[in-house]
Amino acid sequence: MEREIAFGLENFNTDINTMKRNVSEVISLLGLNKIRDKQTTEISGGEKQRVAIASVVSMDPQIIAFDEPISQLDPISAEEVLNSIKRLNRDLGKTIILVEQRLDKCFHMADRIIFMENGEIIGQGTPKNIPENIVNKYHLPTITYIFKEAGLQTLPITVKEGRDIIRNNKFQDLKEDDLKFKEVVMEIEKLNFEYERGYKILKDLSFKLHRGEIMTVMGENGAGKSTLFKIIAGMIDKYKGKVLIDNKNIKSLKLKERIKKIGYLSQNPNDYFGRKTVFEEVGYTLKNIGEYKEEKVEQVMKLLNISYLEDKNPRDLSGGEKQRVAIACTIITDPEILILDEPTRGMDAEAKENLGEIIKTLAEVGKSIVVITHDSDFAGDYSHSVMLMFNGEIVAKGCARDILYNSMYYSPQISKIFKNKCNIISSKRAIELLKVI
């Protein structure tokens, strides 16, 4: 890890004494002492981000630009990275430019905010003074938008401010009936997985997924979430236990059957791209299984609002555009089970809302959806059930409202505001409640 931090200094031909001093100081500043002797392959996602930050800071630039540094991180790791960024500004006087979609985490940190659209600056302001043309759902933190939509004059930008606003109000807990799913489409029985060196990644996992269910899977980076669903998607076959799809062992399914049963979106959309245009890319799997129809490709591209990209090279797109193209590649075969690993990464609020509505529509027609995410607000708005993983084990699984509302780290922002007042996890329900105060 130390060598990684020193790499930039080596390229600048920095003398050894200066290099040692800079690396040591940056390691202390960013709290990396515990992992200084580890390989970069052995550390968590949050630690990797902080090492990357340290690599830049060691060269002592005056301006540091961060492009979505917390987009793939769990809540705890995200806070660690943002705290490191704050220290660079506060303690070292660095000028920070932060590009980020997770506004709830960082909006309040800014001295100045620049709003862009279609390559143009459409407004500037501060967290407490936002231009009127910017005050809409897609340019505000979730909690700010919720209070604005409810008609309140005082708009919070942090959980504490939101709690202060409703401090003297009383609410009744929601009494909604939980959906009762009947038909099991996937069952995992005593699944275990370990690397060749004997380190156990997954430990005796068992759970079920039902037809029409939207299940969100959450947990810290390195908890085993992606590994579990790579096994279910058939990408890893050396495991112990059973993966049953419609009561059939997945190992007995032929490739075409598996493609029709399970659609899998990996964390990296670039994994899907090898064709010259987006249109070719989206239709590629259909050609492979002998079911290509041009109108089907057009239909899916329209659904995900990517028709305007059809002639572009998928590798030339923005992060959010790549993500939507990869999702189109995943759902084009109309699979019964859809597994989406970090599907909202790089998406703005509008794209996330559109994706959420697509997921709801698919579930309503009987598709089963698994969403692996760190986005608690997205989970609160669209999940039927939630499964929490820690260190390769399932530590909780159940109704989304029960799991998310009672979680310390994975509850949506709005749940934190209503804590001990109302068991709410959904933005829409929060707006309804706030309209009457």
UniProtKB/Swiss-Prot annotation:
GO cellular component, alphabetical, reads:
ATP-binding cassette (ABC) transporter complex
Give the matching Pfam families: ABC_tran
Sorted UniProt keywords: ATP-binding, Cell membrane, Membrane, Nucleotide-binding, Repeat, Translocase, Transport
Supply the enzyme class, top level: translocase
Is the keyword Nucleotide-binding assigned to this protein?
Answer: yes
Q: Which PROSITE patterns match?
A: ABC_TRANSPORTER_1, ABC_TRANSPORTER_2
Tell me the CDD domains matching this sequence. ABC_cobalt_CbiO_domain1, ABC_cobalt_CbiO_domain2
Q: Which residues form a coiled coil?
A: none
Coarse class of the protein's main subcellular location: membrane
The residues that the entry says bind ATP are: 219-226
The ABC transporter domain extends over 1-143, 179-416
Membrane topology term reads: Peripheral membrane protein
Role according to the record: Probably part of an ABC transporter complex. Responsible for energy coupling to the transport system.
Recorded hits in PANTHER family, A to Z, give: HEAVY METAL TRANSPORTER
UniProt name for this protein:
Putative ABC transporter ATP-binding protein CTC_00753
Which species is the source of this protein? Clostridium tetani (strain Massachusetts / E88)
